[in-house]
Amino acid sequence: MSGFKQHTGLVVPLDTANIDTDAIIPKQFLQKVNRIGFGKHLFHDWRFLDDAGEQPNPEFVMNAPRYQGATVLLARENFGCGSSREHAPWALADYGIQVMIAPSFADIFYGNSINNQMVPVRLTESEVDEIFQFVEANEGAEVTVDLEVMLVTANNKQYSFEIDEFRRHCLLNGLDNIGLTLQHADKISEYEAKIPSFLK
């Protein structure tokens, strides 16, 4: 995986609190175990008026022409609550979302997002309010997220955020659990060479 350093992208504002993983990706779409193909089902019950996903809901914000191609999702508190399904960040990533900004995220969802190379940015409620106002008032509004200096820039204003150093290291260097393990491949091979043959 390539690392995440900085991203500037169009923002889609999802002005709802406590969005759970069943809303992000409904259970009927969880049959697959790879990460590809879930984007078309993202927020299915909100994006579409029919079960087949052929009739877009014109009232849902992500279907608005002005937000097509958005790569930054702006949300309210407790985003990603509910079950621990990793399909939720898979769906967001497959749709094209690279950054999520909210006052808070569910803990498991937060970790799963980072494992899938998406950056969940926690700002204060008042800061999120300011960005909502900026995005909704300005078609084509973009924000820049700089992970190296941990700053969000929106409407010529900067907002600082925090992320623990280990997770930041993983994001900057594009490391998932497998990548972290492979960093120690030499030591693993050295250890395996010392194991008695009857234990192999």
Curated annotation (Swiss-Prot):
EC annotation from Swiss-Prot or TrEMBL: 4.2.1.33
GO CC terms in record: 3-isopropylmalate dehydratase complex
Record's keyword annotation contains Zinc:
no
Instruction: List the molecular function annotations (GO) for this entry.
Output: 3-isopropylmalate dehydratase activity
* Keyword Cell cycle annotated: no
**What's its top-level EC category?**
lyase
Q: Name one GO biological process term.
A: L-leucine biosynthetic process
Q: Which domain of life is it from?
A: Bacteria
Write down the chemical reaction(s) this protein catalyses.
(2R,3S)-3-isopropylmalate = (2S)-2-isopropylmalate
Give the keywords, sorted: Amino-acid biosynthesis, Branched-chain amino acid biosynthesis, Leucine biosynthesis, Lyase
One Pfam entry name: Aconitase_C
Q: In which pathway does it act?
A: Amino-acid biosynthesis; L-leucine biosynthesis; L-leucine from 3-methyl-2-oxobutanoate: step 2/4
User: What's this chain's function?
Assistant: Catalyzes the isomerization between 2-isopropylmalate and 3-isopropylmalate, via the formation of 2-isopropylmaleate.
Q: Which family does it belong to?
A: Belongs to the LeuD family. LeuD type 1 subfamily.
Q: Which HAMAP family match?
A: LeuD_type1
Query: Subunit info?
Result: Heterodimer of LeuC and LeuD.
According to UniProt, the name of this protein is 3-isopropylmalate dehydratase small subunit
Gene encoding this polypeptide? leuD
